[in-house]
Amino acid sequence: MKLGLLVGYSPATLSMPMDLIKQAEGLGFSSVWTAEAWGSDAATPAAWILAQTEKISVGTAIMQMPARTPAMTAMTAMTLYALSGGRFILGLGPSGPQVVEGWHGVAYGRPLTRTKEYIAIIRNILERKERVTHKGFHYEMPYQGSDATGLGKPLKSILHGDPALRIFTASISPNGMECSGEVADGVFPVWMNPERFDVFEPSLAKGFAKAEGNKGLADFEVAPFVT
């Protein structure tokens, strides 16, 4: 079992408990996690922590997918991963309609479809096998809508990303757990009782079966939040 520290998002006044974070690193904690709601963001504090630590992994729990394009998130993740020597972990989530539609002003619908599209695009960017194209329900690259200029073209990231960058997703439902098992490297399950892992295991198994290769729990991390 690994231990992580969740510092969350900031209240009205921004501060970062670096003494606590450095103590956790000294005690052998494996990770520290930032968060966001509708105030401070998750990526900037992660960069701040990475710059002041040496060994501990730093991740986002979570970055809201509807708030950023997949390409922008990939750019942020690649940059943090490279600057930190591979210590950054990208944690993503769909958030909820109150925040997505009320704060970001975009439609919330079909969050699991968004998750699969989002991660597929990010992994394509990290792999750099070809120029990125995508046509899905939520995302189209290059954009070809009725208001498009027609000047967009497929691109490949200038920065060489690392496909080893880990991607976690948040889940509050069996379908969400299945989605995580299929497309992610780890999951933040909500309301998890360690003694009742049997509740989660069937959904993860369905996701693993849909993934490429012989994916299983040995290739996956379950990271519940405890208080």
Describe the role of every protein-language-model region.
Residues 9-11, 38, 64-66, 94-98, ...:
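Active-site-proximal loop/turn and secondary-structure-junction residues that shape catalytic pockets
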Residues 3-7, 32-34, 58-61, 88-92, ...:
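Hydrophobic faces of well-ordered beta-strands that scaffold small-molecule active sites
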Residues 15-19, 44, 71-75, 182, ...:
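Generic recognition of short, well-ordered alpha-helical segments
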Residues 1-60, 165:
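N-terminal beta1-alpha1-beta2 module of alpha/beta enzyme domains
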Residues 62-67, 109:
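The substrate-binding groove and active-site-proximal loops of carbohydrate-active enzymes
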Residues 40-44, 66-71, 75, 98-101:
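Short active-site-adjacent helix-start/loop capping segments
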Residues 74-186, 190-220:
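Internal, glycine-rich beta/alpha segment that forms the wall or movable "lid"
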